[in-house]
Amino acid sequence: MWRSYKAETPELADETQEVDLNLHDSSESDHEGRQSRSASITSSTSAPASNDVTLQVPITNSSATSPTPSTGSMYFIAGMFDGKEKVNREQPPMPTTDGVEYPRAASWAAGNCANVLNDDKGKQLFRVFLFQSLAEENLAFLEAMEKLKKMKISDEKVAYAKEILETYQGSINLSSSSMKSLRNAVASETLDMEEFAPAIKEVRRLLENDQFPRFRRSELYLEYLEELLPRSYAEKWAQSFEGLLGNHVGRHHFRIFLRSIHAEENLRFWEAVVEFRSSRHKANAMNNLGKVILSTYLAEGTTNEVFLPFGVRQVIERRIQDNQIDITLFDEAIKHVEQVLRNDPYVRFLQSSQYIDLLSKLK
């Protein structure tokens, strides 16, 4: 039976957060020295559905109509693909950990992008990540659109809309139809906000399906989490294999250890199946992801091959061929992989410098 892995939280049960383990991309460190063995499961059809996000953008008293967002306005450079301006980009400040406890920061990676965008410190950390990924214009565009919606004076609103178009049309990646709608909206004196909707939707989808998954697996986010992680959480991993897998930081350090003993593909497979199960309400996404998992981890001779008992892989292959794909497709395979990880690598990890050194750093 598949287990539900939860992150360690304070003793209050109602504060427990489900850990979202969707596997969309790996962090840069995950690829170091292991590019031939790491696999990234990405699929636009398997990505979580985009939800509307209410961006909490501070409203300034200034009458200026610059589309540069008030939060972080000193470092956003319009036309970021211009060489001179790109060199002059100034990194936004990292958010401090003051007033932030581990469960709050861990919740930023759960669910969808709204969780991080609706938290001031989470959004600032996400902003830093986007800056490092040369993609901060996407968040800045959404913030500018939120400010536009809140403006009341029509003349200022029209002028601001024109500046938004001038600022972002060369840097955000929009389809031709959405860009046309954006230009039509700006050209109209009535400023029908429905004309802006396609562009807003596409940028939100890009954040949700591409940049947010990268963020929650990034070194930047994991290091921030590790700074907040109480030692008591990490100590519990010695008694709970499930607790280790259900914790972002714990799973990250376990992955590094598994890489050192050439067994990382087992955890990658486990994470991919978690994502597969999370797509159970999207038939096409589940079908596509099931086939990707089969070819990436279970095909004979693949670099990331996970070895299963005789017959288990054949059953999976047959079910996929017969289009009998459901949430139980990988159940037997996961039981075996969990047992493999628990029997030897988990025990060795608890005795490793990777775990001991982490404990020594935590308070």
Swiss-Prot record:
Pfam families: RGS. Disruption phenotype: RNAi-mediated knockdown in ASH sensory neurons results in hypersensitivity to dilute quinine. May be phosphorylated and activated by egl-4. Keywords: Phosphoprotein, Repeat, Signal transduction inhibitor. Residues 21-35 have a biased composition (Basic and acidic residues). Gene3D superfamilies: Regulator of G-protein Signalling 4, domain 2. Coiled coil: none annotated. Residues 1-70 are annotated as: Disordered. Residues 112-225, 240-359 form the RGS domain. One of its GO terms (biological process) is negative regulation of signal transduction. Residues 36-50, 58-70 have a biased composition (Low complexity). Modulates chemotaxis responses by regulating positively the sensitivity to CO2 levels in BAG neurons and by regulating negatively the sensitivity to quinine in ASH sensory neurons. This is Regulator of G-protein signaling rgs-3. It comes from Caenorhabditis elegans. The gene is rgs-3.
